[in-house]
């Protein structure tokens, strides 16, 4: 459920931003990035509360944090008193959670990887292009879900395995 939950947390603001610009013919990519930034900055405390409730219902797992922890029985009161928007919560976790980092950086890595994916697919075809892009992304940044479930050391080990896979000559056939 973590993977699905994280995917939705990334896709929902993208879909909302894309829907807002769908009728315009100009530079869609630039407009998408700009509209996405507006969507993220428009989040409020209620969005953070709803996110926490959904997070709890989904049984998603992340690295434990000190501030605004879901394990804290007073998390909702603290969110309200701290006037914490969903974007502000994501900024608190950007150093240890990939999804939070995307929110905090206006999806910078997602847009970079989209361009890389496009290039890889044009060179290697759909399947191999997707696999290569995924391996490169995993090699560059340890996966926060692996880190949450098995520890940072294991996540770094998996990233190292992705590097090895990219260096394997059979991948280039």
Protein language model annotation of sequence segments:
Residues 1-2, 158:
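Short intrinsically disordered, low-complexity coil segments enriched in acidic
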């Amino acid at each position: 459920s973590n993977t699905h939950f994280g995917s939705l947390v990334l896709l929902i603001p993208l879909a909302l931003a894309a829907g807002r610009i769908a009728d315009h013919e100009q530079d869609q990519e630039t407009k998408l990035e700009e509209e996405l930034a507006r969507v993220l900055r428009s989040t409020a405390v209620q969005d953070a509360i709803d996110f926490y409730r959904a997070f709890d219902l989904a049984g998603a797992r992340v690295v434990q944090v000190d501030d605004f922890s879901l394990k804290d029985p007073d998390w909702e009161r603290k969110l309200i008193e701290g006037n914490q928007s969903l974007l502000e919560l994501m900024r608190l976790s950007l150093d240890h959670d990939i999804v939070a980092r995307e929110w905090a950086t206006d999806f910078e890595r997602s847009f970079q990887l989209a361009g890389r994916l496009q290039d890889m697919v044009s060179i290697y075809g759909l399947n191999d292009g997707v696999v290569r892009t995924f391996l490169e992304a995993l090699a560059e940044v340890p996966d926060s879900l692996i880190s949450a479930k098995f520890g940072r050391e294991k996540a770094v080990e998996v990233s190292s395995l992705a590097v090895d896979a990219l260096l394997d000559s059979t991948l280039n056939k």
